[in-house]
């Protein structure tokens, strides 16, 4: 078969018409320096603040400093093999992490990748780590409780759903123990939990995960890990990743609780990054935006309205509010709450639980200092029973502290003072609680009732603990239905008061303690 020149030219023209080249514009740059996990890049003209930059070897960096001639970026992961002259490119994406129910019961790193050896995670999608917090109109007041299971906290420093309650204290005062117990207490409450471990030893984190599993709370919890061996960038971003995972539940009309353990280490990691990026240092060498670092994170914890949830789910969920409750932890040095980061976080949060090393060392655990611990919005969320019965607890402890200081110098005290001192000592003893033993509302109400109405006055101080244990065992075995109903409702009326009175009086008559 022979083709003439006309046919050949027509064929070529047809092929040219069919030929389609898809052009794709990419912003590329060159690494000009690498040091301590920070790279400087030349040539990225269109990069955004916080954008992911693709590096050789399927790694990413995040652009943090946008300067006139270069971009300062922090590498997410190992950087030892990066060198000057390597080519990098913009992705046009902000850092996102996987979210969804498939993360519950799993241990993940800052990027949401599983590190527990249980296989891949079945996530429901991805969410940006940096999200603008809900506005004032989208929020609702805090009026539902989060029961921590601790008598001292639920009675004097109550926490509500959507609240930010700071746990602050020196090292080794039980901050993590309090937060872990709060998570364990939620295993039957329907509240999903996220535990973010920042800058901690891997052995400590493994112990926490084991304890959660032992007490049946891990199935309801996501553990986000940025251990001490991780880069400063991953430690800085871990709380935002955990928050994005918690917002998934909040925005779908569910309740979630997130623990940041601890934000002091996150601030130190951010300081390290900022100094390496040559940003100007301020007080205690922290950068000027360290307040914003924590405020933009903690403002994302909120109780959102049913309208917000309905809008977010496109009408799939109606008439349901959602909440994300935050328990940030801050470590102080020698009880100095006036340092830079502690004062910042105190001013951002809705109250603080101050744990004191002197109380901890004297055997009062949880070592809550009731004088300077406060909950600014939680009292509206307290259950009726606890609210009614805990009114005199704080007063009794305040009077006891005042009189105890005075009694050190006075030799002979009148009967009224002696009675107040004795009552204060017994209440202090009653508020002691073992770790991993959260108490339901019904048990707390019964114990507080006994303290409030003078049923402890004739019990020796040394026997308060055994009295409490025996009373609870008696009530749970002989008045099971009443205790279960009270734990569910948390109500308080004359009928419940009479029933509590009957239980305590019958128990004391038996003298089984």
Swiss-Prot record:
Pfam families: ATP-synt_ab, ATP-synt_ab_C, ATP-synt_ab_N. F-type ATPases have 2 components, CF(1) - the catalytic core - and CF(0) - the membrane proton channel. CF(1) has five subunits: alpha(3), beta(3), gamma(1), delta(1), epsilon(1). CF(0) has three main subunits: a(1), b(2) and c(9-12). The alpha and beta chains form an alternating ring which encloses part of the gamma chain. CF(1) is attached to CF(0) by a central stalk formed by the gamma and epsilon chains, while a peripheral stalk is formed by the delta and b chains. It comes from Actinobacillus pleuropneumoniae serotype 3 (strain JL03). ATP binds at residues 169-176. The keyword NADP does not apply. Produces ATP from ADP in the presence of a proton gradient across the membrane. The alpha chain is a regulatory subunit. It is found in: Cell inner membrane. Its EC number is 7.1.2.2. HAMAP family: ATP_synth_alpha_bact. Belongs to the ATPase alpha/beta chains family. This is ATP synthase subunit alpha. The record marks 373 as: Required for activity. It is a peripheral membrane protein. Signal peptide: none annotated. The lineage of its organism: Bacteria, Pseudomonadati, Pseudomonadota, Gammaproteobacteria, Pasteurellales. SUPFAM superfamilies: C-terminal domain of alpha and beta subunits of F1 ATP synthase (SSF47917), N-terminal domain of alpha and beta subunits of F1 ATP synthase (SSF50615), P-loop containing nucleoside triphosphate hydrolases (SSF52540). GO terms for molecular function: ADP binding; ATP binding; proton-transporting ATP synthase activity, rotational mechanism. Its main location: membrane. Disulfide bonds: none annotated. It catalyses: ATP + H2O + 4 H(+)(in) = ADP + phosphate + 5 H(+)(out). One of its GO terms (cellular component) is proton-transporting ATP synthase complex. The gene is atpA. Keywords: ATP synthesis, ATP-binding, Cell inner membrane, Cell membrane, CF(1), Hydrogen ion transport, Ion transport, Membrane, Nucleotide-binding, Translocase, Transport.
